[in-house]
Each structure stands twice: as structure tokens, then as C-alpha cells.
A protein has these predicted regions:
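Active-site environment of divalent metal-dependent phosphoester hydrolases
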Residues: 27-29, 60-62, 82-85, 109, ...
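A general structural detector for well-ordered alpha-helical segments in enzyme core domains, enriched
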Residues: 40-44, 62-66, 89-93, 117-121, ...
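Active-site gating/metal-coordination segments in enzymes
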Residues: 52, 60-136, 181, 185
Length: 263
């Protein structure tokens, strides 16, 4: 299937195998009129010059099938503490070489991010030196200050604020403030519409704790990349946000092209 046949723009201008996308969904989402199966993901990665994409879906076994089939695709375990056996499933999948952390969506799954039921999972992530990407930007469960409670309780955990507050300036500023107070908190850019806030985050929080994410297929990847490019950052810092920071966080080294062996 050609790029045109699956609805991708005809040109992008991005070098091949360069970007690292910290936030991608796979699956069918009829409510949003979008979908991303394995073949489409493979073509999307190639088309946009994405060297590696972190993908997830509430059905973790489906994600496993996708990442095993698609070069450049890596899984984040969807962790829902309301589901019996969620911890055991997470531990099993985190042993898989293509799973590099967890995704938490307290808004969708209706739990506080610092619920004690989550704590054993975070302890496991700390032991493995793996991050948690947490949806951030909506009441009642995903405000940045609620997620901060988890980051404070586990200062050795690597906590990524997905969407860095999303579309509300109060929550965006709050996310930057939370990251400023907590050196274990990272900011991820997808779905956050204010391009200048990306540069502000880099300036205030530091150049190594802001990550590019697209939220594909819900957001168009080229638009999300362009936000970073026009944010006011220098070219070196644009490169750091678009790829190097995620390589460091997920792969273990900012110059690595795949995860460093876990021993």
C-alpha cells in the first residue's frame, strides 16, 4: 500500500530513521475515526523518519504482536491497577526485549496515580530503571499535581507527564512547575498546542527532560514535529527533544539506536 493510499502526506522533509516518538497508540479507534494496525504503523514510521516509536493499547497482548512484527516499534505496558493480575502481566512483558516501560492512563481507567495499588509496579520500574508515561492534563485523576504525589513518593522513578498538561494553560504551566520541582519528572509534548511552551520547558526544566511525542494516530505527526521545530529552540536542542532525550530514557544512551542490553 502506498503512502497516498493510507492517507499520509506526500512529503515530510524529515530525515529517515531519525525521530524517536515517545507516545503512539495502536488499535482501532472508531470514536475518533482513526486506526493504527501493524502494517500501517510500519509504513508510518518509515514515512515520517521515525527510528523508534513507543506504542501501547489497553490490550497488551495485541501490542506484543505488533512490536514483534514491526521494526522500530517498542511497547509500553498498559498498566491498569483495577484489572486483577495487572502487575503479573506487567512484570512478564517487561522481561520482553521490546517492552521498555509502562503507560498509565488514570483518567480513562479511573484511579489516582498515587494509588497504593500502583506502588508495587513503580518499585518494579525503579528496579529495572524503566520509565512510566502517565497521561497528564485532565481532572480529576490526571492533573500534574496528582501525578507529582507519585513522583515525590518514588524519587528514583522516572515519571513522564504525557501531553505535559494537554490544552489548558494552567495545567501546562503546572506541569512545567512540577518538573522543575522534581528532577525525576520528564515532559512529553504531544497534544500540547502551545509551541513556545516547549522552549520554555527546555529553558526552565533543562534540555534533557523534554521529549517529543505525537499521540498518533490521534494527532498528525508532521504537525507535532513542527511544533518543536518552530518553538524557538536552537537546532541542537530541537534534535535533543526530537530524538536524543528519548534515546537516553528508553534505550539507555542518547546515541543508541536500540535498547542497551539489560545484562
Amino acid at each position: 500500500m502506498t503512502d497516498a493510499e493510507i492517507g499520509l502526506p506526500s512529503t515530510t522533509g524529515f530525515a529517515p530513521a531519525t525521530l524517536v516518538d515517545a507516545h503512539m497508540h495502536v488499535g482501532d479507534f472508531p470514536l475518533f475515526n482513526v486506526h493504527m494496525d501493524g502494517p500501517r504503523l510500519s509504513q508510518t514510521l518509515h514515512h515520517y523518519g521515525i527510528a523508534a516509536g513507543m506504542v501501547f493499547h489497553p490490550d497488551n497482548q495485541y501490542v506484543r504482536e505488533v512490536v514483534e512484527a514491526v521494526d522500530g516499534a517498542y511497547g509500553l505496558v498498559w498498566a491498569n491497577p483495577r484489572i486483577p493480575g495487572f502487575l503479573e502481566e506487567a512484570v512478564e512483558l517487561l522481561d520482553h526485549p521490546k517492552f521498555l516501560g509502562v503507560k498509565m492512563h488514570p483518567l480513562l481507567d479511573a484511579y489516582h496515580p498515587n494509588d497504593p495499588a500502583v506502588h508495587p509496579l513503580i518499585e518494579e520500574l525503579v528496579r529495572r530503571d524503566m520509565p512510566a508515561l502517565i497521561h497528564c492534563g485532565h481532572p480529576i485523576f490526571t492533573l500534574p499535581w496528582s501525578i507529582e504525589e507519585l513522583a515525590v513518593a518514588f524519587p528514583a522513578a522516572k515519571v513522564i507527564l504525557g501531553h505535559m498538561g494537554h490544552g489548558n494553560i494552567i495545567y501546562i504551566n503546572g506541569s512545567i512547575d512540577v518538573a522543575l520541582r522534581n528532577p525525576n519528572v520528564y515532559l512529553e509534548t504531544s497534544g500540547m498546542p502551545m509551541h513556545t511552551k516547549i522552549a520554555e520547558a527546555v529553558d526552565r526544566v533543562g534540555p534533557e527532560r523534554v521529549l517529543f511525542g505525537s499521540d498518533a494516530p490521534f494527532h498528525e505527526i508532521g504537525v507535532e514535529v513542527r511544533k518543536v521545530q518552530v518553538s524557538g529552540l536552537t537546532p541542537d536542542l530541537v534534535t535533543r527533544v526530537l530524538e536524543k532525550n528519548s534515546r537516553r530514557l528508553f534505550f539507555g544512551d542518547e546515541n543508541a539506536d536500540r535498547p542497551i542490553s539489560r545484562g
